[in-house]
Amino acid sequence: RTLQFMQNYLFFQEVTIDDIYTVRQMLEPELAAGAVPHLTEADFEALEHSISCCDPTQSHEDLLTQRREDVNFHDILAAANPNPFQRFSCELINEMIRQLIVFGNRTPQTEHRRFGEANAQFHRDIVQAARARDAERVRVLMHQHMQDAASSVKRMKGRIQGRLILDADTLRRPRPVAGRKRA
């Protein structure tokens, strides 16, 4: 029901990429740091799989699939965070990114590749810090990642296309991982 209220509200708002990334830069570092003590080995495996799928040096997927997998990395972290409101807020933003942000056809493939490589490296560094249970390092790395992502999306002339239309089943969950147990 809350999702439907958000949908109704946001449908009539002019939401920009700057709006999305301003909020994302505040929430994602805290979400990731809060997830650190709760990450299981299955979560780490899912995070590493996500990295291999979104890294253009390792993946044979098309660029759109790689970008969606990049966002899935953040959903995996969200699923491990015990704060339901923070988790919901970040998942909503991630779904907006999946559905609404598009790039112009004039953006060179090399730019997309560079963006993907940078994201994959940030993700590897975040996983390494999370494995060391260094929540503060994860927070710092995620903050840097969000700043880099925001500037990359602007540089690549990303724009909002359409309006957010969600229903109760729209928020995508990360792929289920066998043996997932809450810490």
Predicted regions: what is each one?
Residues 135-183:
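C-terminal effector-binding regulatory domain of bacterial HTH transcription factors
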Residues 2, 14, 66-67, 116:
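Short linear sequence motifs
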Residues 20-104, 119-128, 137-152, 156:
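Conserved amphipathic alpha-helical segments that form helical-bundle/coiled-coil interaction surfaces
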Residues 106-114:
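Short helix-coil transition/hinge motifs at the ends and kinks of transmembrane helices
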Residues 1-27, 33, 37, 161-163, ...:
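Short linear motifs at protein or domain termini
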Residues 13-16, 59, 111:
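General structural signal for secondary-structure boundaries
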